[in-house]
Amino acid sequence: MSSVNLNVLDDNVLIKPITEEKQGGIVLPSSAEKKPTKGEVIAIGSGSRNSSGERIALTVKTGDKVFYRQWAGTEVEHDNEKYVVMKESDLLAVIK
């Protein structure tokens, strides 16, 4: 599990994409490659607020491996590492 010095806000999740190893040695331009949809949760926010102002805790935790929507989130780079920040609702499943 990785750690990063970023404070994720609200119901956002910081994901480190896991890229699948390619077989066959064919090199594709980055625009033709399929974006990763699997990653590791690196950091989570404190949750959104309900109508009473109370925090609603996220269901994922740091270290979880997850599947997420292919075009979800915003790609960010921090300390020469690439991450994706997205809403927890863009996560599809936790891998057990």
From Swiss-Prot:
SMART domains: Cpn10 (SM00883)
Main location: cytoplasm
Domain of life, source organism: Bacteria
Single biological process term from Gene Ontology: chaperone cofactor-dependent protein refolding
Any one Gene Ontology cellular component term annotated for this protein: cytoplasm
Gene Ontology MF annotations: ATP binding; metal ion binding; protein folding chaperone; protein-folding chaperone binding; unfolded protein binding
Compartments where found: Cytoplasm
Keywords, in A-Z order: Chaperone, Cytoplasm
Cited HAMAP family: CH10 (MF_00580)
Family listed: Belongs to the GroES chaperonin family.
Function: Together with the chaperonin GroEL, plays an essential role in assisting protein folding. The GroEL-GroES system forms a nano-cage that allows encapsulation of the non-native substrate proteins and provides a physical environment optimized to promote and accelerate protein folding. GroES binds to the apical surface of the GroEL ring, thereby capping the opening of the GroEL channel.
Record's subunit section: Heptamer of 7 subunits arranged in a ring. Interacts with the chaperonin GroEL.
Protein's recorded name: Co-chaperonin GroES
Organism (species): Wolbachia pipientis subsp. Culex pipiens (strain wPip)
